[in-house]
UniProtKB/Swiss-Prot annotation:
Residues 586-667 form the BRCT domain. It comes from the Bacteria. This is DNA ligase. One of its GO terms (biological process) is DNA replication. NAD(+) binds at residues 32-36, 81-82, 110, 133, 167, 283, 307. It comes from Staphylococcus aureus (strain MRSA252).
Length: 667
């Protein structure tokens, strides 16, 4: 047994060393196969001799049992955001404020990693808890997922009690590999590495997180008591010595001109990095000076984040293609010579509508400027007429639908051209894709490519046909093995039990969104009652306007639609509202019977989760602020709704006040 104990210690040392070389130094000394062999040896020993499994074992990196949900936990000290600078003038004003308060200053410049802020707590040197930033006061406990990140030490090199903060991110190579895998499985791709990192860290099954190959850079420590550091630069050096991964592309500079030089350098070199950055963080380096400057309610006075402007690149417009949405809107898309924008290769970009093409004088063959709106959605900003070739072609939208050949129309008051043929193939396919989407019937495994195959094979012609699919229909399809078919049929069966509002939204009735579907389902309770409703009745319902009322009645009066509903009934698809009616709920008097509006960005829950919880307490959640509104819950960046509420003297809660009230009810 002593020999086995010695071997376990040896395996710990080897695996930790090889992991550090691979994930932190990016300089592995052994092949992956050697690491895997040693890891499996340790796993086997721990399975046969559980007494040898420790909290800092390298096997923890593999992930553990799936969790039911993430607990909300208060931060010991708030995770504040930074003020933003967008240009040189903003930075010089920041520098002036600093010097007026504390005199001469040295700055620390660090890359702003485009990821997810996390807080890591260590007790006696062991990693015990990891939280997301959340709203800065309360975060989610994602400890098990963070343990799978090799750049996070499970045990520090010194037995300290400390809390460090950093940015979890997905390296570009991990992002490309993940999206390649998703594409093979006909799953929706992640838009960028940041979204991929955030989604990976919120997996309830840490084994899935482990497969995503995330990393982290630590950038600060909460309490310097056990640190012999007098500056930010010395603190980062101390963190390195303790086994943490900090970003080495940092620099101490003596003045604001040095800051500007650092920004210029990394603005031009950011694409050479193996991870995404979205700016530069500038901090007063001296810790005593930081203490002297202090904090505002939202951010430290001694630091600022310079945000990179949206990157613009020039490429060639090769062609313009059209896509037809489920409501018949015809959208032009630019086909581009592939070009790298904000870290990803772009070959297609939105042109929105015909008016934009003409207003910006965009022609096929032009050199065009492309950027990503919010570093996510590619769009063509403008053409460059001085580079225009002689054979550039002025684009004219077609008069007939490229899918079905029906004449296109422009409805008064709209900029978009629209195909109004209800049997248009492109619209039908898009309608099927919408029907199975998450907020509609939520049929997992029915991706775009599978739906296209099913439609082209004439196995489905309308949404009801989905519930008639059999194993024999699905097995011959591309990339559809037995297990995938079994899972898909189970998902289809499960979708039959969805509540009425899911079905209503899934049917794709024009102007009828998620919220209005919920309102109608709760009001009428069954599809049969809805089939008898009049336009005059609908417009009397709060949150149902004239357009929605007219659209719903016209849709449900159509004989083809009534036949479709019967076809769904024949396969026992639920047509009844399964939720609790707001009027029947005896909720807490703090919420019951009140009309509440949510506005701004929430951090501790989604808007949908907040709405459902409020409804469970008997509140009525509406989308607009009126004199009848009782409370407005204002998240981050709340806009005109908050302003209107203030002018009407309506009670306003912050997100934290709302969460506190929830906690009071639950305690």
């Amino acid at each position: 047994m002593a020999d086995l104990s010695s071997r376990v210690n040896e395996l710990h040392d080897l695996l930790n060393q090889y992991s550090y070389e691979y994930y932190v130094e990016d300089n592995p000394s052994v092949p992956d196969s050697e690491y895997d062999k040693l890891l499996h040896e340790l796993i086997k020993i721990e399975e046969e001799h559980p007494e040898f499994k420790t909290v800092d074992s390298p096997t923890v990196r593999v992930g553990g049992e799936a969790q039911a949900s993430f607990n909300k936990v208060n931060h010991d000290t708030p995770m504040l955001s930074l003020g933003n600078a967008f240009n040189e003038d903003d930075l010089r004003k920041f520098d002036q404020r600093i010097r007026e308060q504390i005199g001469n200053v040295e700055y620390m410049c660090e890359l702003k990693i485009d990821g997810l802020a996390v807080s890591l707590k260590y007790v006696d040197g062991y990693f015990v808890q990891g939280l997301t930033r959340g709203d800065g006061t309360t975060g989610e406990d994602i400890t098990e997922n963070l343990k799978t990140i090799h750049a996070i030490p499970l045990k520090m090199k010194e037995p300290l009690n400390v809390e460090v903060r950093g940015e979890a991110y997905m390296p570009r190579r991990s992002f490309l590999r993940l999206n390649e895998e998703k594409e093979k499985n006909d799953e929706q791709l992640f838009a960028n590495p940041r979204n991929a990192a955030a989604g990976s860290l919120r997996q309830l099954d840490s084994k899935l997180t482990a497969k995503r190959k995330l990393s982290v850079f630590i950038y600060s420590v909460n309490d310097f008591t056990d640190f012999n550091a007098r500056s930010q630069s010395e603190a980062l050096d101390e963190l390195d010595k303790l086994g943490f991964t900090t970003n080495k592309n940092r620099a101490r500079v003596s003045d604001i001109d040095g800051v500007l030089e650092y920004i210029e350098k990394w603005t031009s070199q950011r694409e050479s990095l193996p991870y995404d950055i979205d700016g530069i963080v500038i901090k007063v380096n001296d810790l005593d000076q930081q203490d002297e400057m202090g904090f505002t309610q939202k951010s430290p006075r001694w630091a600022i984040a310079y945000k990179f402007p949206a990157e613009e690149v020039v490429t060639k417009l090769l062609d313009i293609e059209l896509s037809i949405g489920r409501t018949g809107v015809v959208t032009p898309t630019a086909i581009l010579e592939p070009v790298k924008v904000a870290g990803t290769t772009v070959s297609r970009a939105s042109l929105h509508n015909e008016d934009l093409i003409h207003d910006r004088d965009i022609r096929i063959g032009d050199s065009v400027v492309v950027k990503k709106a919010g570093d996510i959605i590619p769009e063509v900003v403008r053409s460059i007429p001085e580079r225009r070739p002689e054979d550039a072609v002025t684009y004219h939208m077609p008069t007939h639908c490229p899918s079905c050949g029906h004449e296109l129309v422009r409805i008064e008051g709209e900029v978009a051209l629209r195909c109004i043929n209800p049997k248009c193939q492109a619209q039908l396919v898009e309608g099927l894709i919408h029907f199975v989407s998450r907020q509609a019937m939520n049929i997992d495994g029915l991706g775009t490519k599978i739906i296209q195959q099913l439609y082209q094979s004439e196995l489905i012609k309308d949404v009801a046909d989905i519930f008639y699919l059999t194993e024999e229909d699905l097995l011959p399809l591309d990339r559809m093995g037995q297990k995938k078919v079994d899972n898909l049929l189970a998902a289809i069966q499960q979708a039959k039990d969805n509540s009425l509002e899911n079905l209503l939204f899934g049917l794709g009735i024009r102007h009828l969104g998620v919220k209005a579907s919920q309102v109608l389902a709760e009001k009428y309770e069954t599809i049969d009652r809805l089939l008898t409703v009049t336009e005059a009745e609908l417009v009397e319902i709060h949150d149902i306007g004239d357009k929605v009322a007219q659209s719903v009645v016209t849709y449900l009066e159509n004989e083809d639609i009534r036949a479709l509903i019967q076809k769904l009934k024949d396969k026992h698809v639920n047509m009844i509202y399964k939720g609790i009616k707001t009027s029947d709920i005896e909720g807490h008097p703090e919420f019951s019977g009140k009309t509440i509006v949510l506005t701004g960005k929430l951090h501790q829950m989604t808007r949908n989760e907040a709405s459902k919880w409020l409804a469970s307490q008997g509140a009525k959640v509406t989308s607009s602020v009126t004199k009848n509104t009782d409370v407005v819950i204002a998240g981050e960046d709340a806009g005109s709704k908050l302003t209107k509420a203030q002018s009407l003297g309506i009670e306003i809660w912050t997100e934290q006040q709302f969460v506190d009230k929830q906690n009071e009810l639950n305690s």
